[in-house]
A protein has these predicted regions:
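Active-site neighborhoods and metal-handling regions in enzymes and metal-associated proteins
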Residues: 1-124
Length: 124
């Protein structure tokens, strides 16, 4: 999962699109034989914690935010969630705890980054 995060960050450069982040994460994770949680995604960061664009960890053509061009000054949370088995998750009765449906292990790494003229800057 950490390597998937690093690959996503490498693709978070001026002129690329959200698609470039999402697709690079998905290609790496699936090539390693793992699956990607689809219900939870990264996001923009601004005056509120969760703003557009959404930063999915997969390249679903139906996600319009994939076409958003990355511009200098944007802050993004990139946060791949990778499962050893099925990609499906469930929320416990406490309304907060999330588990894989099949009981296999899952991992999540996250960084907040700033898109700069030269390379992404990790803020966390």
């Amino acid at each position: 999962t950490r390597k998937a995060l690093d690959i996503g960050i490498e693709n978070a450069v001026v002129g690329n699109k959200v698609f470039d982040i999402s697709n690079s994460i998905q290609e790496y994770v699936e090539s390693e034989g793992f699956s990607i949680v689809r219900e939870l995604v990264g996001h923009g960061i601004g005056r509120q914690l969760h703003i557009t664009p959404q930063i999915p960890n997969f390249s679903n053509p139906a996600t319009m935010d994939l076409n958003v061009e990355l511009k200098e000054g944007m802050c993004l949370a990139i946060e791949p969630m990778v499962n050893m088995g099925s990609r499906h998750i469930k929320t416990d009765s406490d309304g907060w705890t999330i588990r894989t449906q099949d009981g296999n292990a899952s991992a999540h790494f996250e960084h907040s980054i700033l898109i700069t003229k030269f390379q992404p800057r990790i803020l966390t």
